């Protein structure tokens, strides 16, 4: 066994070496630009930071043979001064909600009072950041005396983290912006250097989880629409990161020399199919980020879980454990968030997240993930050798072990397995053998809707074909 696992860590900027800050600007103007993004330094830095946080949330084997896990509100994670300052920032943003009460008039989409709240945040952004972040970090000077300070870059990602005041929506692109805001602070040496995993866990539990909770409050208060969503065919209307970090919390424990687990679960962890049971969700949402996100779905959606969240329902049938779910979620984030034009088109690029090509990057294959829809001139993506194309809206790496809902109980998910011994659609036999570490772009998973066949609802009328998404082939 190797002495240590080769863990990539997001590099920090050496202030003495000179650095020129740049006001972030839009570089992704059309779907073809996504291919350039996937070989950029910005992409590598984002994935490096996310994987760094992900590994930190996996339970740890201690020297005495016990296991330390990292639930929400654990006493085992201490918050550094920068983390507490960021918590103060989130508190101030929450307090601003009182100054923008929801409009009581008729509306079709979103509450226009969200624009008022966002205007308050935008007008006070420099003041808020100045109160909650060190001045030496914000006012870090460029080597070019005519250039901007670090604040200009951080503020762009900070303001991009709360939704769109024009469209009255919030989605994974805004969540990505907050991840970049934190990664930018990391690159500027804004977090203390500690034992690997220590500060990362504080960032996740002390900042990211409170951020997600604040965002959920904002979404409910102003009835924000999903941004860049695939609707019922997507994973979640608004978020993705809690499913990555929450599945990591439930993965099997590792030592510092172990690779990131790709299957198995922490002993005593709830079964993945617990997401379909409201009482389990209510219990687990208090300690786990995955179930916390599921709990929000229960808060805002009605009806059978398999009907309004078919992909999460599909994933709940995986029997290989939370380690496999975690691996799949990372691959899916790459494919469904970072490789999707509608999601990343608004992400701005400066010096902290550079549009320059990473020298070690390998150009990604052309993929339907990089555009809003699949090209009309070509069929679905061809699966890897040895794999059977997934059917319907299945997560590409899920297995057909989840029981189907009762026949006749509303519109069935087209990919759900039939009961009474009927053979479900054959799932993919294996996951592509891809590294979980950058620098090259991760091999994107197939779009879940890319299968050419249309499934029939279990127990339904064979002449009835489920309604397809408008962008499905």
Curated annotation (Swiss-Prot):
Entry EC number(s): 5.2.1.8
Subcellular location(s) per record: Cytoplasm; Nucleus
Comp. bias regions, Polar residues: 368-378
Keywords from the named record: Cytoplasm, Isomerase, Nucleus, Rotamase
Segments for region (Disordered): 360-473
The protein's name: Serine/threonine-protein phosphatase 2A activator 1
Sequence similarity: Belongs to the PTPA-type PPIase family.
Coiled-coil intervals: none
Function comment: PPIases accelerate the folding of proteins. It catalyzes the cis-trans isomerization of proline imidic peptide bonds in oligopeptides. Acts as a regulatory subunit for PP2A-like phosphatases modulating their activity or substrate specificity, probably by inducing a conformational change in the catalytic subunit, a direct target of the PPIase. Can reactivate inactive phosphatase PP2A-phosphatase methylesterase complexes (PP2Ai) in presence of ATP and Mg(2+) by dissociating the inactive form from the complex.
Main subcellular location: cytoplasm
Gene responsible for this protein: rrd1
Organism listed in the record: Aspergillus fumigatus (strain ATCC MYA-4609 / CBS 101355 / FGSC A1100 / Af293)
Top enzyme class: isomerase
Molecular function in Gene Ontology: peptidyl-prolyl cis-trans isomerase activity; protein tyrosine phosphatase activator activity
């Amino acid at each position: 066994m190797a002495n240590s696992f080769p863990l990539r860590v997001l590099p920090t900027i050496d202030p003495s070496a000179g650095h020129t800050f740049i006001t972030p600007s839009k570089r992704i103007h059309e779907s073809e630009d996504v291919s350039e993004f996937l070989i950029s330094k910005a992409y590598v830095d984002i994935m490096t930071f996310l994987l760094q946080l992900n590994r930190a949330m996996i339970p740890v084997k201690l020297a005495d043979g016990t296991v330390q896990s990292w639930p929400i509100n654990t006493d085992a994670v201490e918050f550094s001064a920068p983390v507490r300052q960021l918590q103060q920032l989130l508190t101030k943003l929450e307090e601003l909600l009182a100054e923008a009460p929801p409009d009581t008039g008729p509306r079709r989409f979103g509450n226009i009072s969200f624009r008022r709240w966002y205007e308050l945040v935008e007008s006070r952004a420099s003041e808020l950041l100045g109160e909650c972040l060190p001045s030496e970090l914000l006012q870090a000077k460029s080597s070019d005396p005519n250039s901007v300070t670090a604040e200009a870059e951080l503020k762009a990602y900070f303001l991009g983290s709360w939704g769109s005041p024009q469209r009255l929506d919030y989605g994974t692109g805004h969540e990505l912006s907050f991840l970049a805001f934190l990664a930018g602070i990391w690159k500027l040496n804004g977090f203390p250097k500690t034992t690997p995993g220590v500060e990362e866990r504080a960032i996740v539990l002390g900042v990211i989880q409170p951020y997600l909770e604040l965002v959920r409050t904002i979404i409910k208060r102003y009835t924000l629409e999903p941004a860049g969503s695939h609707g019922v065919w997507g994973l979640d209307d608004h978020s993705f990161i809690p499913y990555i970090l929450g599945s990591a919390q439930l993965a099997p424990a590792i030592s510092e020399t172990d690779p990131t687990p790709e299957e198995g679960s922490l002993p005593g962890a709830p079964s993945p199919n617990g997401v379909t049971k409201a009482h389990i969700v209510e219990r687990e949402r208090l300690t786990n980020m995955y179930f916390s996100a599921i709990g929000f779905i229960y808060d805002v959606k009605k009806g059978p879980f398999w009907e309004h969240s078919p992909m999460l329902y599909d994933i709940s049938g995986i029997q290989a454990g939370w380690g496999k779910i975690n691996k799949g979620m990372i691959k899916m984030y790459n494919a469904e968030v970072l490789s999707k034009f509608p999601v990343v088109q608004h992400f701005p690029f400066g010096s902290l997240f550079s549009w320059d090509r990473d020298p070690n990057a390998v150009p990604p294959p052309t993929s339907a993930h990089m555009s809003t829809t699949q090209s009309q001139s070509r069929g679905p993506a061809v699966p890897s050798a040895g794999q059977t194309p997934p059917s319907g809206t299945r997560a590409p790496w899920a297995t057909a072990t989840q029981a189907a809902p009762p026949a006749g109980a509303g519109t069935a998910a087209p990919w759900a397995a039939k009961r009474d011994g009927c053979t479900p659609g054959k799932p993919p036999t294996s996951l592509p053998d891809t590294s979980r570490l950058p620098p090259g772009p991760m091999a994107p998973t197939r779009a879940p809707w890319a299968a050419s066949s249309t499934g029939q609802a279990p127990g339904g009328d064979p002449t009835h074909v489920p309604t397809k998404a408008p962008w499905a082939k």
